[in-house]
UniProtKB/Swiss-Prot annotation:
High-level lineage: Bacteria, Pseudomonadati, Pseudomonadota, Alphaproteobacteria, Hyphomicrobiales
Family as reported in the entry's similarity comment: Belongs to the Fmt family.
Record-listed E.C. numbers: 2.1.2.9
GO cellular component terms, semicolon-separated: cytosol
Protein name: Methionyl-tRNA formyltransferase
Coiled-coil region: none
Keywords, sorted A to Z: Protein biosynthesis, Transferase
Amino acid sequence: MRVVFMGTPEFSVPILTAIIGHGYEVVAAYTQPPRPAGRRGLELTRSPVHEKAEQFGIPVFTPKSLKGAEEQDVFASLEADVAIVVAYGLLLPKAILDAPRLGCYNGHASLLPRWRGAAPIQRAIMAGDAETGMMIMKMDEGLDTGPVAMAEKVAITPDMTAGELHDRLSVIGADLMIRALGALERESLALQPQAEEGVTYAAKIDKAEARIDWSKPAKDVHNSIRGLSPFPGAWCEMEINGAVERVKLQRSTLGEGSGAPGTVLDDRLMIACGEGAVRLATLQRSGGKPLPAQEFLRGQRVTKVL
């Protein structure tokens, strides 16, 4: 079976690796173009999928768009049986969707129709969802609206971070995709339409959302911290030894206590929220590495959280 793989971030890599490992012929990998990196933006960083594909000698394509006839002709010339799409980052026009003999299949990190869109892992945690999952669906022209081929649910534990959920779903996605490809080869892959009720959208995380609002209930603050960990990272300003610094918050737990929002309630970083309190468990100063609260506080006195 001739496969075109389309993906960009680290999340996509285990699925690409599994497809290669199970003997499928990956004739091309499509990924986002290299991005400027370094302090001056003079270096170009290739995506994790780009790096992995080159390790296996797979031709890599990095178009900025797939809307043009020339790019669509190149894609069609690959004569793919199927395209596998996992966090690619570009919308696929109808000409691309129709080109593979068996269609295009997407690995999506939510229980559709909940959390269609760009940031399903973060949004599920930020909303306080108790479960999510990984789904394989056949793509159509809508945004994550196609019929579902396979799904597996995953519990979201109370302190689970987006990074931990990301890693879990990536592994599950690799297993599901291999099972789906096998069923597709055997012509036994059953498709079920998505429910019409319960549709929500997982908008891309806005930078403004990363700043913690201590006037919100503790549950919401805790969900924001873990939902944005490790990237982009929730943050706040702290008065440390009399100077105000910006600090990233990577882990927290729900606690007990009350006070004006942002009040430091004890010497172990219990912080009052609009309702209840959270204990900050892992913090990261600018230019530093994440530290457990006990180590972060060594020789430091936090008097105010803004």
